[in-house]
Amino acid sequence: EFAKYIDGMKVVYDTVSNELKSLLDRGEFPFVIAGDHCSAGGTIKGIQRAFPDAKLGVVWIDAHADLHTPYTTPSGNLHGMPLSTALGVENVEMVRNDVDYETKEYWESLKSNYLLPENLVFVGVRDTEAEEDYLISKFNIKNYKVDEVLSKGVGQILFEIEEKLLHCDLIYVSFDVDSMDPDESSYGTGTPVKNGIQVKDAEDLLIGLLEMPKTAVFEMVEINPCLDNKVNRMAEISFSLIKKISLLNRFQ
């Protein structure tokens, strides 16, 4: 009830983390394209297994904070929880749900406790619940809201992110397409939120982040053509972003 399909998600976490570790052990650059954002917890677990002693920096570009737990979730949807598994938080101060034993056991198995909150940066987050706001405030997690991206410009945002994560050994960039403004892009994603990042800013942001030498893993999630109000526009935009990223010198 408070963590829907968590048994299946355990399989996804294990599968993704195994593949990520294998790629990183071979010196490859993992490029993850996923549906539901909850698989990101498995991505982080894979990074942890490959680099257990490394300091990981995470740039989370998303309309949502994804900081819920089974104890705080209003929906039970695991795609709202992957960062909590990486941070290893319960958010006991904001508990609203009485979670059963089996769910607790599965939840503990998903947690990696690898990411430190000071090494997490949000970009574009604009749809959160009180329980998530509490953690953002408690840990003083930086969120570059859309208006700040517009006012400062992508170049300045990139400079500040690189400075903030300077002490990290590697960086993981997770891009949810719902971070973009659905009226400009499309509604071809599971949980679109208005007033998002402009497509060109998203492109410049991703190219800048992927050019950073410490960036070791990239992920793009939540493309859903079945929900697209412009035929297949979201997938087309996403493919264009992927193509431009793939042309960077580091991938030649």
Give names to the regions the model predicted:
Residues 1-252:
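Conserved alpha-helical scaffold segments that buttress catalytic/binding sites
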